[in-house]
């Protein structure tokens, strides 16, 4: 997995699957939030999954902290997973 951040957008290339990936993503997103942003966009063009720790962290941001989380998903399998978990609205999922 490779990550890049630009403004309030985090782009994640490759599959998200390890606790190290979670730590990297959480650190980047938390840096954006700590910088005062009330919205974070995650561009995930090709991962087929998200770990439960990432899902939990993003839910905390959206539901408890009031951060507008937007997930732009490229792979239909990840989109289907988020749909099955009823997270389309919580993460403002957009299929790209």
Question: What is each stretch, according to the model?
Answer:
Residues 16-91:
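Amphipathic alpha-helical interaction surfaces in cytosolic regulatory modules
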Residues 1-11:
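Short beta-strand/loop segment at the start of cytosolic alpha/beta domains
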Residues 94-96:
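Intrinsically disordered or low-complexity boundary/linker segments at protein termini
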């Amino acid at each position: 997995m490779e990550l890049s951040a630009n403004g309030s957008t985090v782009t994640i290339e490759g599959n998200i699957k390890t606790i190290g990936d979670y730590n990297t993503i959480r650190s980047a997103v938390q840096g954006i939030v700590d910088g005062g942003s009330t919205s974070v966009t995650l561009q995930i063009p090709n991962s087929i999954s998200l770990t439960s720790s990432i899902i939990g962290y993003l839910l905390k941001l959206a539901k408890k902290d009031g951060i507008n989380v937007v997930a732009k998903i490229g792979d239909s399998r990840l989109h289907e997973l988020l749909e099955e978990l009823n997270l389309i609205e919580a993460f403002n999922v957009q299929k790209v």
